[in-house]
């Protein structure tokens, strides 16, 4: 007698449930997705014991006929697709016909449903077996209750986490679905307590506020981009609004929440050098494309997808985010009384806005007397005693005298003084225009130069030899001088590292680097990559290398330290990428060459530093993502001194 036999349906469903029903959140996801596919406009989810005891989902969707109710709990029975051609043009959230039978096989299910055109149907199942079937009320929609999850698979129960953890997973699922479908009203309750409520208005900003809070949602800016194959819309948080994990990035593809690491990497690339290490933004992206370009039939849970043109989509997302930040002044403002502001925000009707300080227009797009970034950083890297380029210092007084005359004449006429009412009016301004990223690279560069993102700042002093104090008509600014020159140096060195140059400095005494045998071999395999960054390693014995020259723009006195850092990156990186290697080298050199704390600067040096900073691509954060400038509005300062209440 043969040893191979066919499994009965209940056992097969239990096996399938191992992939589909991982935890209570999986049940919530499948049931709510069914409600959305049924054209529901309102969905209520009720949980007890984080869903382990009870999960109830009520919707006002299409409902089901009696014969469809029975068929819905059969394996691979679905109304979503008809043939194999439909499999490549999936617009619904469900299509496999596995969820309901898998859920029913490991729980007790009660289903009440009706199409609204006649009496409804009630089914009761236990462990996948039909227990009762009867007529029910004719309310249009579906009411399904899943109880005693995993009652017949005790081994699965052992892997469940605490109620708090499981509830967090379930709430996260509902949050993502609410973001993906803002036109559907969602209400999530746990033991009668409302955890989430959305109004189904279709405005995703209201959903963001319901999930992350009103203050966070107000600090998110809209983006929009389109290519031949993709349309991307969404909201991204300002660089100062971050979290400790990537869990706050929500990616929606054709209405389906997905997890995709390459897309998350593309988002992070858009925030390049704007985020501190280990911090991640809050992002909501809704991506629309032809279903042919995405394969959702990768895993039964339908969270993983594959794209046909993934590289093109990644580039579009990165460019869109970068363009959004190029058009904005990203200076964080300090609130005088955060508790009071928060309380007012919760009481008042709110709007979403990011206050943008528009700098005074320059006739030619560039302030008079400002020096070229590369020339300034080049002079700084030559090791002169002055921390700032001499050329910039020479030009600075002309700028400063003219600027100071302008500012103080305005102060005398009362133009500069910000009135509280005007400040409040700016706070209430709504920024509705999304950012589009459809311009070629040179056009984007021209636009960046035309819009002066960092307003002119007029120094008034220095705090502890570390922070520059400056002012303009918008209030007081504190500038971290080390971070500011780090940004200037970083952009200079990044450009130099990408150039092919024969300008090298020969060393009278070669530098020697010795490593263990295993590390020596790994370094030797990457000599070409290091050479493309200006580091030419020459084998010297069985475990050592010599460096006889280096590019002339290497920071003087820091050559060995920088080369060691670059070699260390080669040793620690899983794969050596020339772009990452140059990036790391630029960051290291910019930090080593920057002004340090407790270093007092002359007025002309401060002017030169600020004017050079204004010419950089991203003057708001250092290469490590730390802020360079913090803003105190005149209104907030007046609140500190109780001049306004």
From Swiss-Prot:
Q: Does this UniProt record's set of keywords contain DNA damage?
A: yes
Q: What GO biological process, any one, is recorded here?
A: mismatch repair
Q: Which GO terms describe its molecular function?
A: ATP binding; ATP hydrolysis activity; ATP-dependent DNA damage sensor activity; mismatched DNA binding
Keyword DNA repair attributed:
yes
Write down any Gene Ontology CC term.
mismatch repair complex
Stretches assigned to coiled coil? none
NCBIfam families, sorted: mutl (TIGR00585), PRK00095.1-3 (NF000950)
The name this protein carries in UniProt is: DNA mismatch repair protein MutL
> Which species does the entry assign this protein to?
Geobacillus thermodenitrificans (strain NG80-2)
